[in-house]
């Protein structure tokens, strides 16, 4: 992948306005994944690569009014779609690169990242940045509302062991970035890897 995010912006910007209508049935899967992140009232959580902010209402529900929810995305058009959908009421929206976040070290209890890892130009560096902003013992959810095989089929590809989300690749990638993989689910209707911040 390129070192910049032009390819990500070029892909998502023209699709932002109708992104939610293209995948209208994903909402419950987001809510279930957020539920498995183990958030508590008052926690601080980041939705990294938040897109149109589909996870923000569930994240706000989990941390309550005393918690902090931040949604960061590198594509302005996706954040604009989140605003049109009224999701800024669930969290603060920030135009930011997930690999260079405008957050202090160790300020988050958890990070939620739906579909993000395959869009990071340097995945270990990007996951390391997510670890930097998470406290020791903080949690990470790498999520997609469909599993690897279904996603590969959607894009006209065959499933490959080279996929970053394949467990044999993901486990050492996370470890090198400061995370320990705790659970891994790759099913037809979802992908969810949960990790804990080490150190």
Enumerate the language-model features and the residues they cover.
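Conserved beta-strand signature within the Rossmann-like core of class I S-adenosyl-L-methionine
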Residues: 138-144
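A short SAM/SAH-binding and catalytic strip from SAM-dependent methyltransferases
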Residues: 110-122
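A short acidic, Gly/Pro-enriched loop at the edge of an enzyme's catalytic core
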Residues: 99-110
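Class I SAM-dependent methyltransferase SAM/SAH-binding core
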Residues: 46-48, 52-100
């Amino acid at each position: 992948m390129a070192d910049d995010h032009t390819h990500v912006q070029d892909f998502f910007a023209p699709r932002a306005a109708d992104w939610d209508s293209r995948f209208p049935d994903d909402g419950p899967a987001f809510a279930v994944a957020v539920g498995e992140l183990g958030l508590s009232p008052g926690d601080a959580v980041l939705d990294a690569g938040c897109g149109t902010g589909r996870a923000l209402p569930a994240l706000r529900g989990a941390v309550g009014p005393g918690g902090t929810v931040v949604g960061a995305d590198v594509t302005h058009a996706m954040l604009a779609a989140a605003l049109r959908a009224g999701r800024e009421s669930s969290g603060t929206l920030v135009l930011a690169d997930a690999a260079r976040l405008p957050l202090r070290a160790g300020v988050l209890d958890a990070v939620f990242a739906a579909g993000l890892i395959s869009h990071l130009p340097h995945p270990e560096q990007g996951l390391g940045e997510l670890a930097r902003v998470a406290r020791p013992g903080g949690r990470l959810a790498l999520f997609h509302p469909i599993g690897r095989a279904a996603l590969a089929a959607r894009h006209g590809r065959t499933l490959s062991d080279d996929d970053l989300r394949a467990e044999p690749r993901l486990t050492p990638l996370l470890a090198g970035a400061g995370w320990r993989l705790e659970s891994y689910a790759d099913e037809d209707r979802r992908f969810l890897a949960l990790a804990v911040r080490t150190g």
